[in-house]
Amino acid sequence: MMKQLSVVIVVYNQSCRQSLTCQQLQKIPHTDMQILIFDNSTRDYGNRIYCEENGWIYLGGTGNLGLSKAYNTCIDYLKETNFHGYVCLFDDDTELTADYFNALQKAMETGRKIFVPFVYSNGRILSPCRITSYHKTILFPSEQAAAAYQGTDITAINSGMALSFSIFDDYRYDENIFLDGIDHTHLRHMAAKNIVVSILDVRFHHHFSGDEKPSKKSALIRFGIFAKDYAYIFRAKKPAYWYLVGKRALRLTLQYKSLDFLKILLRSK
């Protein structure tokens, strides 16, 4: 019997043994699902061997190809195996529980195509949320408000998202986007097809890079990716680029007391 649930975990510069998502998944019975690891690491962390030991599928391992290429490679692999069912996407640092899969198994029976959990950070619901045309997010004040919302401008982060694999009969992630905005762009495309986002009665507590202060060097690299991705996303909407990316550049300039962020802003436009 073919498994109806595939789990995709994208790991970046760490071993699967140290990945919170992989650690949590090992504690959950998963004989009824197949697990794919896409390794975006820039050096060998022994993840291929780890996957072989656990009967997981290992893909990637040729450097950081970006998130969209990672997802598309996994989708193409599943296509080749004639997979039909649902695919779940996870970062490598998601606090995963069995409750998620129990809720998802029941939700899959409805035939709906996209499911997302509630994702909390610092006591706030960060996902799902609403999003404007300028990619400004509007948080829901409560789970009840999120569950009752009927608008088409709802969005969510990738980690924890479950998708009917039928979505990928005529869709792939845009590989011009390396990392930032992939989730929002994807769900806007789905909304245009009248595909509704359904919310699971499950809660994750997720660690976000924005919750900490990295070194200036790391912040510059990270902002460079953000600016380049949104320069592409907003290539036909320059005011949105200046609003979203400019606002972040100004904040980082003040935070690090460096004009280098403004230089990246101007160079990426």
Task: Report each predicted region and the residues it spans.
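Short beta-strand-to-loop element that shapes/binds the nucleotide-sugar donor at the catalytic cleft/hinge
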Residues: 115-131
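Short beta-strand-to-loop acidic/aromatic patch adjacent to the donor-nucleotide binding site
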Residues: 84-95
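Short, well-formed alpha-helical segments that are part of the catalytic scaffolds
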Residues: 9-29
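A conserved acidic beta->alpha catalytic loop
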Residues: 16, 37-47, 63, 94
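Short, flexible, basic/aromatic active-site loop/helix in glycosyltransferases
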Residues: 132-154
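Glycine-rich, basic loop-to-helix element that forms the pyrophosphate-binding segment
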Residues: 61-78
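A short, conserved alpha-helix in the catalytic core of glycosyltransferases
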Residues: 155-161, 166-171, 176-201
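Non-catalytic, C-terminal membrane-associated alpha-helical segments of glycosyltransferases
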Residues: 217-269
